[in-house]
């Protein structure tokens, strides 16, 4: 369980950690958080022997798994894997929990069927080379622009410009 807080104030991460600690196991604690916290909460939980990766129960925020010959990795953006020498394996499904250890990846909780992915992943948050749910961010942005151009083809427009990347 979790030993201490960073200060006299509680932040969201520490609150989730304390809620996980209320379970009799990491899985029970994650289930408790996923079923009682309003909103989306995907997480990675580090233990002495494993990393648990849990995607929020509606699949709004992504987590994917990568692999190389030395082991596994997980992240919210699979585009980071190539720079680290890993290849993409798969996305976690809504509510899915996996345990990654030296022995491999083990499914702890299977994915649910209800998915409500955040569309801002493709429109705003995602790095252009990232892929979410099998759809490339840059391609989605170009296709969205093309669809808007077709929709507004009969309007007299002087100029159209994309929204610059943020951050």
Question: What does each model-identified segment do?
Answer:
Residues 1-94, 99-164:
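Conserved short alpha-helical segments that host acidic/polar catalytic motifs at enzyme active sites
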Residues 167:
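Carboxylate/His-rich catalytic cores and anion/metal-binding grooves
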């Amino acid at each position: 369980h979790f030993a201490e807080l960073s200060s006299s104030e509680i932040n969201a991460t520490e609150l989730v950690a304390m809620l996980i600690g209320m379970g009799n196991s990491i899985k029970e604690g994650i289930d408790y958080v996923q079923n009682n916290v309003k909103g989306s909460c995907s997480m990675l939980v580090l233990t002495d022997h494993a990393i648990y990766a849990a995607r929020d129960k509606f699949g709004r925020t992504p987590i994917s798994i990568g692999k190389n010959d030395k082991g596994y990795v997980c992240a919210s953006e699979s585009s980071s894997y190539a720079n680290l020498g890993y290849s993409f394996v798969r996305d976690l499904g809504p509510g899915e929990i996996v345990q990654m250890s030296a022995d491999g990846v083990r499914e702890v909780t299977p994915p649910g069927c209800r998915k409500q992915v955040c569309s801002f992943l493709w429109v705003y948050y995602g790095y252009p080379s990232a892929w979410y749910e099998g759809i490339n961010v840059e391609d989605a942005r170009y296709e969205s622009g093309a669809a808007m151009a077709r929709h507004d083809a009969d309007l007299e427009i002087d100029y159209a410009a994309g929204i610059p990347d943020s951050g």
